[in-house]
């Protein structure tokens, strides 16, 4: 019960931060929610690994050599339920491996796993790299909250105990009697109350994501048009970007690789990306919606960043030239 309480407190705090709406608080909400999800996954995975190790011990009881058909079938059935130690170490360490294992076991829908991979990348960006995507952080926080509550309800650890020192008065806030022993709907009731008051409808999330992508594509079109006005080819742009990035890193200049024009080899994709963004209007499932949004965002971001860097570098060079001309 204490573990459930810790998860609920995180979700309550994340909800409060989301309702506030300030970007700085939405950032904290995403960090809290990502941690809550990872802890929920960790608890469920631990149960899975304990079960797998039990089967591994059972497997050791079989004698070596060929068994009769029935015995061999049983041995193969038990062996299929074990997990190699090397994989267990990866599952214990990596978020993505936890998602893969629970998806393979049928405990985590594929759409949920895909969305969580994108959202975990969001958390890594804003926590470790201080990169906050301001226009999409609110929809991301809402979807992550929705998933976290769903996992709290569905990924129940193998057992839940009540200790004599447990404080269960907090259940009163959810309309649950002080002694909820035997209730099968405890988590569902808590989840319903947690979701109340948040705009978790798919229409609102969809509109925000499409508007966000539209604004970014507009900026990319404007930057592309500006650079085209200078008569610069994708090869020219790639060379300028490579030169600029080496200069920023304090590295000596080097000849550009003429064959490598990334990310400007994707300039022709702008029309397709805009069409794909418009296509999100037909998606009614939030998880599928965010999965497609995240995939599209990951695809366009290298070109978006490259265009902006070259535009900024040209503008900075122009300002330096103006200062020199004025004798500044």
Located regions from the model:
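Polyanionic, low-complexity intrinsically disordered segments
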Residues: 131-328
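Charge-enriched, short contiguous segments at helix-coil
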Residues: 24, 99-162
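A broadly used, surface-exposed interaction patch
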Residues: 49-121, 128
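Active-site-adjacent bridging/hinge elements
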Residues: 3-15, 117-124
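Short, hydrophobic, well-ordered secondary-structure elements
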Residues: 26-48
């Amino acid at each position: 019960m204490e573990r459930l309480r810790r998860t609920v407190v995180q979700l309550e705090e994340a909800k409060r931060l989301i309702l506030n709406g300030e970007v700085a608080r939405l950032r904290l909400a995403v960090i809290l929610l990502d941690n809550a999800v990872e802890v929920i996954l960790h608890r469920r995975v631990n149960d899975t690994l304990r079960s797998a190790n039990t089967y591994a011990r059972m497997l050791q009881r079989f004698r070596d050599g060929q068994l009769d058909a029935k015995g061999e079938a049983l041995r193969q059935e038990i062996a299929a339920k074990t997990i190699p130690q090397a994989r267990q170490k990866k599952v214990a360490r990596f978020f993505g491996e936890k998602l893969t294992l629970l998806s393979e076991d049928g405990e985590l829908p594929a759409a949920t796993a895909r969305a969580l991979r994108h959202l975990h990348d969001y958390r890594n960006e804003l926590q470790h790299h201080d990169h906050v995507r301001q226009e999409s952080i609110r929809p991301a926080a809402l979807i992550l909250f929705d998933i976290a509550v769903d996992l709290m309800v569905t990924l129940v650890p193998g057992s839940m105990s009540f200790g004599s020192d447990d404080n269960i008065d907090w259940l009163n806030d959810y309309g649950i009697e002080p002694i909820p022993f035997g209730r099968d709907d405890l988590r569902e009731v808590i989840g319903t109350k947690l979701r109340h008051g948040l705009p978790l409808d798919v229409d609102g999330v969809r509109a925000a994501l499409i508007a966000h992508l539209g604004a970014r594509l507009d900026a990319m079109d404007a930057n592309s048009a500006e650079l085209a006005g200078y008569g610069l080819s994708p090869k020219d742009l790639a060379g300028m970007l490579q030169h600029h990035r080496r200069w920023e890193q304090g590295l000596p200049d080097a000849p550009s690789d003429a064959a490598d024009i990334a990310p400007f080899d994707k300039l022709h994709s702008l029309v397709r990306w805009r069409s794909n963004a418009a296509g999100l209007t037909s998606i009614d499932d939030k998880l599928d919606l965010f999965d497609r949004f995240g995939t599209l965002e990951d695809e366009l971001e290298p070109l978006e960043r490259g265009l902006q860097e070259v535009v900024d570098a040209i503008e900075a060079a122009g300002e330096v030239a103006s200062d020199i001309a004025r004798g500044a």
